[in-house]
Amino acid sequence: MADRIGKPISQRQLRVGEMIKQSLSMIFIKNEAKIPNLETNMITVTEVKMSQDLKIAKAYVMPLGGKDEDEIINKLKEYSFLIRKVLSQKVFVKFLPKLLFRKDESFEYA
């Protein structure tokens, strides 16, 4: 498996991405970030892709039921600083990556 540039994805990228994916899932399930208007929405984190230098994490998310997707993605982007703060208490890495939230469109093609 390779990323966009053609460089193979390292084991470290996969491992850190999986740690962040699991931690984000728990944050959303327990609503630990206390994001307004998201308490009633279940959010699925389908994948987290890490950059080569582990400074950027692209989290692909999908709201359960598929309604208000764009609104939820915008809310996650708006509160990414708060999510990152809660994430820093769960994931111990040298540099916590910047979080970029993207809508997972793989469900539409499946």
Indicate residue ranges for each PLM-predicted region.
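Charge-rich, low-complexity N-terminal segments
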Residues: 1-56, 62-110
